[in-house]
Amino acid sequence: MVEVAVFLKDVWKSYRIGGKLVTVLRAVTARIYKGEIVGIHGPSGSGKTTLLRIIAGLDRPDRGEVIVDGYNLNMLDELGLAMLRNTVVSYIPQDYGLIENLTVWENVEVPLLLAGVEKSVRESRVKEVLEYMGLADKVNAIVSKLSGGERQRVAIARALVNTPTVLLADEPTANLDWENAIKVAELFKRIRDDFGTAVVIVTHDPRLLEFVDRSLNIVDGTLKEISPPISIRK
């Protein structure tokens, strides 16, 4: 039986913009399963990034239920949500979220430091992930000196270092040419297959949807599934 990694039930979210209350998510209900890649797409301002941030515990919904790997995010305080992001769920923002003046090794080590992992375990895990990502020769490179493709791989390595159940990526190929975008898409497929990770990608590029198992479309804050869930696919 396929396990649910993320469960969203009747999720609503509004923001006050220019003195006006704007609803960006409306009654969103969905399941995302372990071992699948889900692509979320839709027009600009449709609520894609907001939904990703809610799953990551970076934003809270106005109402509705969000459960990630069995954890009800509504029941967690800010410290609990922060710990969740260092253990269960990893979020890669569109700008990669890397610390520019640190080395590749130092950036990848950050989640383990925040989670209080002891030094010997940190060193072993960072080395393992960098080798997996093909970055073993870049450990001492300063992130600001790397190419866009290399920076994205560092961001993914950092997201993987805590062996998350759920990996969230906001427009992961937006700053890449198509050749490097394909490499990133293939990398997400390898992560899915090797670790059984649920990978959720927000994208505006319909070509990237060729690499996902299931796609969800957001229109005016409403989520519409346009391919069958993994539980019923043949």
Where are the regions that the model predicts?
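Helix-to-loop junction immediately C-terminal to a conserved catalytic motif
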Residues: A56
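A short, proline-enriched helix->beta-strand linker immediately N-terminal to the Walker B motif
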Residues: V161-T165
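Short coil-to-helix segment of the ABC ATPase nucleotide-binding domain corresponding to the Q-loop/switch region
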Residues: L102-V110
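Catalytic Walker B motif of ABC-type/P-loop ATPase nucleotide-binding domains
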Residues: L167-D170
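Conserved ABC transporter NBD signature motif
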Residues: G64-N72
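Conserved ABC ATPase signature
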Residues: I142-L146, E150-Q152
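The feature captures the beta-strand-to-loop junction immediately N-terminal to the Walker
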Residues: H41-P43
